[in-house]
Regions:
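Eukaryotic short linear interaction motifs
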Residues: 14-18, 124-126, 162-164, 221-223, ...
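Short coil/turn segments at secondary-structure boundaries
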Residues: 20-23, 167, 218, 236-239
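Edge beta-strands of extracellular beta-sandwich domains
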Residues: 436-442
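Propeptide-to-catalytic entry region of secreted or membrane-anchored zinc metalloproteases
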Residues: 1-152, 157-158, 201, 399-407
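Active-site scaffold of zinc-dependent metalloenzymes
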Residues: 126-196
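Active-site recognition of the HExxH zinc-binding catalytic motif
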Residues: 200-217
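Short amphipathic alpha-helices and their capping/turn residues within compact interaction modules
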Residues: 48, 52, 215-219, 229
Length: 442
């Protein structure tokens, strides 16, 4: 397949490309690219291992340099956006701008999902002595982003100095207990306050946001839940691992960190990609919808901004007779040791996803395939066969229920076993067929 993830180091106009770091840390463009390349490979391998643990094989995405051998492991992208303007923009606006700019550039392609890091992110510094919340820390940070959806996962670089430049430095970086100088540098460590915590939380955030570009929604637990900032526990053993704590929503993790989600639609009969990022913060915050401006290389549906509080899965679905059985639930429930896992629905969706499978020989088949959801009859029809159906809360992307079909011969029809109620929240039906086509309908 030619489908790939493309790591980028985005340098704004008027910026020298050096990321913020202490004076004893190499913050050059080459150093940034080395750190991003190592991080991308870590996520690539971790994706495969965690899918293997779910019993679907070691599947993962390809990186740009594995497809185009002449390309570097991390591409430097010179943006036309002025650095001063970028530092005044909200992360949703940065996501929209860079997404549009990338698609209109020579790199623009529907065969790429971009993993971008903004060089000019800057923590302005503070004299505040009291501990700050994540939102307060972000308010002191310019050109900050941690947002994924559609074809772009975008991040700031305020903690990139805590990342390793080589494979041999990975474990020492996770184990680095040096306190963050939180008056001069961003502390995005899940409230652990260490350089190792910053590396773990920000790498885990990249893992989570990249998952949204692969059409994953939020889950109560696991990688697409709130466990991702303990990613260091996958690589460390014994007493050296960071301890798991619970937040006030009874979730295992460090502390509240930022989440985002995406609403992506693909029309099966025509080529159309629809993407919107949905920013989801800590348990007492709000969610905010952003949107792409129209692109020449893809159809974008615009939606007006919507602000809504975060909701957890509703108990209204607890009585559904066809709810997923115990055998379909997560095989890696949080046990105090490993909160980093794909829930079963995420594993199934990824295992059939176009970015995780060989495209050759399936493209001609896909032309004649039919995938449709009849909202009136609550009936899904797929000529290729249905592999997974998810019911999500449209406001925050939370997966409320899922139905997986992993037998060799998948279902061609599926009647969603509930009806919409005027009092219920707005729901989105997400369907993936045997060829990896994804349909979303609200």
């Amino acid at each position: 397949t030619n489908l790939r993830v493309t790591p980028l180091y985005i340098i704004c106009q008027g910026h020298d490309g050096c990321f913020q770091s202490p004076p004893d840390v190499d913050s050059s463009i080459d150093s940034a690219c080395s750190r991003i390349a190592v991080g991308a490979k870590l996520i690539q391998s971790l994706t495969a291992e965690k899918l293997f643990e779910c019993g679907v094989g070691r599947k993962t995405f390809q990186l740009e340099h594995e497809i185009t051998l002449k390309k570097p492991e991390c591409i430097v992208f010179k943006s036309n956006l002025n650095v001063n303007k970028a530092r005044k923009m909200r992360q949703a606006d940065l996501w929209s701008h860079f997404g549009r700019e990338l698609m209109l550039s020579d790199l623009g392609s529907n065969e790429r999902k971009f993993l971008g890091f903004i060089s000019c992110t800057r923590f302005k510094g503070t004299d505040i002595d009291k501990p700050m919340t994540h939102d307060e820390i972000v308010s002191f940070t310019e050109a900050y982003a941690a947002l994924g959806g559609g074809g772009l996962a975008l991040f700031g670089t305020a903690c990139l100095y805590t990342w390793p430049t080589t494979v041999k430095d990975i474990i020492p970086k996770f184990l680095d207990s040096t306190p963050v100088n939180n008056r001069r540098f961003m502390d995005d460590s899940g409230y652990r306050g260490t350089l190792g915590g910053c590396f773990a939380t920000t790498l885990g955030s990249v893992f989570h946001e990249l998952g949204h570009t692969f059409d994953l929604g939020h889950t109560k637990d696991g990688i697409m839940g709130r466990g991702f900032d303990n990613i260091d526990r996958v690589f460390l053993v014994g007493d050296r691992r960071s301890s798991l704590t619970k937040d006030n929503m009874n979730n295992y993790n460090g502390k509240p960190v930022q989440h985002s989600t995406v609403s992506l639609q693909r029309n099966i009969s025509v080529t159309m990609n629809v993407a919107e990022p949905l920013r989801v913060l800590g348990p007492r915050s709000k969610t905010t919808l952003g949107n792409f401006a129209s692109l020449s290389k893809s159809d974008i549906i615009r939606r007006s901004p919507n602000i809504t509080p975060i909701q957890r899965p509703s108990s209204v679905y607890s009585n559904i007779s066809n709810r997923m059985s115990d055998s379909k639930k997560n095989v890696n429930r949080i046990n105090g040791n490993d909160p980093i896992y794909w829930t079963r629905n995420c594993a199934v969706l990824l295992s059939y996803h176009r970015w995780f499978n060989n495209e050759y020989g399936r493209e001609r088949q896909a032309i004649t395939r039919y995938l449709k959801f009849d909202k009136n009859k609550m009936l899904i029809i797929s000529t290729a066969g249905i592999r997974i159906v998810e019911v999500r809360d449209e406001s925050n992307g939370m997966v409320l229920d899922s139905y997986e079909f992993t037998n060799p011969l998948p279902e061609k029809r599926f009647l969603v076993p509930f009806t919409f109620s005027p009092k219920s929240k707005v729901l989105t039906i997400v369907v993936e067929d045997d060829l990896g086509n994804v349909l979303k309908q609200t």
